[in-house]
């Protein structure tokens, strides 16, 4: 919903109806002006109608404008038939006062909300979090909170990689070395990389790891105790790191949670005659489910060595989400390079009648790149540690706080808190301002800047408003908003776009739409702030009106902060 655009569209639609012109579907009736210096909005509807009716577009535009009688809005015709729309301050203020209050930005409850389970984060137990987990965690958390804001019943599930051969490799190493449990995270982290590397050249060790895996999956008490011990150590470390980014989950389920369902589903699929032998393996054929017009390989249920393929874990997890948790939608916020895998999983869910009416979506995302435009790596070619990335960002933010004369003399504890707020906003906004499916280059100096399209710029603008409102007190709460110039009018128009930005972001599963809106709002507010002398205004009603307008902008920033999970400090 865009309060102003919706009103303008209704006015033009009423004129079209009176003229007996058709209402064209999928044609934008009112759009932002291509020349904001000439008009607030424009309509190209006459051009679209001219094509269908084979009439002169300017004459159509003239007939539309002639039917409109709204003194507070000026409609004029430009060029071959473009309709320019200029709004009076009184009209914009009226729309704002009738439709916008602080409550407008509260979560939008639904009577019978659908249930969405969002699968994001997806780290592997006993492996260090790396930069690859950054996007899934940040995007997934924001989408979860956006869906909650829209009134859906939302569950966030981290879906840990905590089962299969990697666990057997770790257990085999722990037993062989006689390591005493519980292990610290520093003791645990090197075990899997070393064991994995060794298993590729040591057949005896690989056989031992496979044996330990089988024992674990069959419920062996000793292996379950070892697994639970390092699982707990690893998960506590994951929670610690992700909490810095204000990322949390409703469910800490993993592949292990689905273990009991895997064999039952394999048996069921076989009984239905869906599983066929293929080159020593057992598969479900997907030739009738092409991806982008291309035939996809079959879904492997059981490998040639008799082991159940990991894709069946995703099927078993989906079974739990649909049949037990009653999900109406399941979103997978996972690397775009996993598109084929999820196409296969979703296809199997259809073939086996598991899917039902549940809406399945793979919300793929692009890659974080280094300055060389290649996937971000260390100098040695390894994955960049997520904790290292976070630490570098917070350190860089702290340096900015130390260099700022407004904050350099603050108590150390407060400076650290501000640095965390700034650093986390820098990381999150830098990611979320990009379309989800796009790659982006990691540029720390740019991300922590207080200028430009950055998280710190958004925070700085919000803090500026907080300071303004503190200086003003609370006497401005009463009364309607009145607009007096082009700056407050532009800000009021931008405020009215908030709900539309939320709706578009949700429909596209694209937080970048909302992030771009909030950045544009910040630019608009700062333009207003620098050109309108709020605190020295002698007209008390006008001053209070501007303060109320500022408070609404702050409320939008606070709402956005709750959605992407960043904190706005009191000063910076």
PLM feature spans:
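Non-catalytic interaction-recognition regions
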Residues: 1-93, 112-572
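Short, basic, low-complexity termini and linkers enriched in Ser/Thr/Gly/Pro
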Residues: 100-111, 478
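Short, charged, solvent-exposed linker or helix-capping segments at domain edges/interfaces
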Residues: 94-99
